[in-house]
Amino acid sequence: IPVVLTILCWIDIHAAGNVLRAGMMFDVMVFWAIRLTYNWARSWDGFTHEDWRYVMMKGKAENKFEYFLTDFGAIHLIPTLSVFMALLPMNYTLYYPGPEVFWLDWVAYAIGISAVFIQIISDQQMYNFRRTLTEPQTMQSGLWFYSRHPNYLGEILFWFSFFIFSLSNGLSASWLIIGTITMYALVAITSVAMMDSRSLQRRHDFKA
C-alpha cells in the first residue's frame, strides 16, 4: 500500500512537487518495500499460514461478533489506518514541497536508508539463528545483543525519516509527528508487548 500510494502521488509531482526531494523519499520507500517483500517471501509457508498474533487475537473471541470485531478492526482496519497516518508526512511533503533540497533532507535520507539497513541486518541474523534452532531460544548476538527488537527499531526510524522530510516546510509541519507516533504505538507498544509476552511463555532464557 505505501508504495502504491507513493506512485499515485508521483503522477502530479512535476507540477506540484520538488522532484529531487520526492526522489529521495521514493528511494527510501522502495528500498524498504524490497526488504520487506524479500523477508516475507523467503519465510512464506503458503496460503494456509497465518501470523501467530492474528491467531492469538482471534482465539480470544468468545462469539462470532467478537471474532468479526477482532478480524475486521484489530487485524485489518487499525493497521491500515496506521499506515495511512504514517504516510501523512510524505504525502504532505509531496503536495507542499517547500524550498529546494537542503541539509535536513539529507539527514532524513540518511536516517531512512540506515533504518532499512538495520532491518536487513537484523532480519538476516535472525534468519540464520532460527535455521539452527531445535527449541525456542532468545537471540542474543549481533544487533540483537544491543536491542531486543532491532528490526522494530529500524521500522520506527524508517517512518520517522519521512517526518524529518516534512520539516522542509518549517516547524509549521510539526503536527505531522502524529503519523510517526501512530506507527510507534502500533509497532513499539502493541507488537512488542505481544511478542514479549509470548517469549516469556516459550523461552526459558528470555527476561522481561
What are these regions (language model features)?
Residues I75-L81:
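Active-site pocket-lining segments that scaffold enzyme catalytic pockets across diverse folds
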